[in-house]
Curated annotation (Swiss-Prot):
<feature type="binding site">
    <location>
        <position position="158"/>
    </location>
    <ligand>
        <name>(S)-2,3,4,5-tetrahydrodipicolinate</name>
    </ligand>
</feature>
<dbReference type="GO" id="GO:0016726">
    <property type="term" value="F:oxidoreductase activity, acting on CH or CH2 groups, NAD or NADP as acceptor"/>
</dbReference>
<dbReference type="GO" id="GO:0009089">
    <property type="term" value="P:lysine biosynthetic process via diaminopimelate"/>
</dbReference>
<feature type="binding site">
    <location>
        <position position="37"/>
    </location>
    <ligand>
        <name>NADP(+)</name>
    </ligand>
</feature>
<dbReference type="InterPro" id="IPR036291">
    <property type="entry name" value="NAD(P)-bd_dom_sf"/>
</dbReference>
<comment type="similarity">
    <text>Belongs to the DapB family.</text>
</comment>
<keyword id="KW-0560">Oxidoreductase</keyword>
<feature type="binding site">
    <location>
        <begin position="167"/>
        <end position="168"/>
    </location>
    <ligand>
        <name>(S)-2,3,4,5-tetrahydrodipicolinate</name>
    </ligand>
</feature>
<dbReference type="InterPro" id="IPR000846">
    <property type="entry name" value="DapB_N"/>
</dbReference>
<keyword id="KW-0028">Amino-acid biosynthesis</keyword>
<keyword id="KW-0521">NADP</keyword>
<protein>
    <recommendedName>
        <fullName>4-hydroxy-tetrahydrodipicolinate reductase</fullName>
        <ecNumber>1.17.1.8</ecNumber>
    </recommendedName>
</protein>
<dbReference type="GO" id="GO:0005829">
    <property type="term" value="C:cytosol"/>
</dbReference>
<dbReference type="InterPro" id="IPR022664">
    <property type="entry name" value="DapB_N_CS"/>
</dbReference>
<comment type="function">
    <text>Catalyzes the conversion of 4-hydroxy-tetrahydrodipicolinate (HTPA) to tetrahydrodipicolinate.</text>
</comment>
<dbReference type="GO" id="GO:0019877">
    <property type="term" value="P:diaminopimelate biosynthetic process"/>
</dbReference>
<keyword id="KW-0520">NAD</keyword>
């Protein structure tokens, strides 16, 4: 790996893509490529000017295949369909990939797992350092409380977010379920209305809020008799997500082919709970 890895940004024309370009520059790494949709009117524009940091000499392109040779690793915050295509191209080129795309189907996740047998892949629903530390705290709380509490996950995002619950909320739920030896698909309850009957303590509840410009807020409640513990993470801007993804990209270059997550990047798997 070179001292300054060449990082490509996929979905560079979107809000997150522009922040990722800023994050690459702030970290002192090299922007290898910036890719937008093939039909985008932004093709040919300078990526730095688009991101508001001035000209950097990297032009936006609509073809990942044409610029992969300029990248040691790419960061993908696009759509599930686009990510599937990007995985194929990266596998063929032997280029590592960091994926922040949410809303992927089980079939698409299986494609990701297969690709990770051939190239290093980092996949996380949330690249914030704070969120990943929060998940470690959730594992500790779940281990201590066990079956003595009711568990609820509440998440809030801006009105434009199209998937619910958020990938981060599901990631939190999965961490708790795994710690308790449960299958999240079997115990998750999404919203409640009407006559629901008494709450089953084995379930993990999810509630979703959408409105305004909320960047991202997640609270997990461990509710017992006479006391309640809450673990909350609130994001006030998106740079923390971008900085974490760039950190993951620099970390994964040169690693062996397999699937990693932010706990690997941050060394949290070595922290015992």
């Amino acid at each position: 790996m070179s001292a300054a890895p060449r990082i490509g940004i996929l979905g560079a024309g979107g809000r997150m893509g522009r922040i990722l370009i800023q994050a690459v520059q702030q970290a002192g790494y090299q922007l290898g490529a910036a890719v937008v949709r093939p039909e985008s009117t932004l093709i040919g524009a300078d990526a730095g000017e688009l991101a508001g940091i001035g000209s950097i000499g990297v032009k936006l392109t609509g073809s990942l295949a044409e610029v992969l040779e300029d990248c040691d690793v790419v960061i993908d915050f696009s759509t599930p369909a686009a990510t599937s295509e990007h995985l194929k191209l990266c596998r063929e080129a032997g280029v590592a990939i960091v994926i922040g795309t949410t809303g992927m189907s089980d079939e698409q996740k299986a494609e990701l797992d297969e690709t990770a047998k051939h190239i290093p892949v980092v996949y996380a629903a949330n690249y914030s350092v704070g969120v990943n530390v929060s998940i470690k705290l959730l594992e500790l709380a779940a281990k201590v409380f066990g079956d003595t509490v009711d568990i609820e996950v509440i998440e809030a995002h801006h009105r434009h977010k199209v998937d619910a619950p958020s990938g981060t909320a599901l990631m939190m739920g999965e961490a708790i379920a795994d710690t308790l030896g449960r299958n999240l698909k079997e115990v998750a309850v999404y919203g409640r209305e009407g006559h629901t009957g008494p709450r089953d303590r084995q379930t993990i509840g999810f509630e979703t809020i959408r409105g305004g410009d909320i960047v991202g807020e997640h609270t997990v409640m461990f509710i017992g008799e006479g006391e309640r513990v809450e673990v909350t993470h609130k994001a006030t801007n998106r740079m923390n997500f971008a900085a974490g993804a760039v950190r993951a990209a620099a970390w994964v270059v040169g690693r062996e082919a397999r699937k990693y997550d932010m706990k690997d990047v941050l060394g949290l798997n070595d922290v015992q709970v």
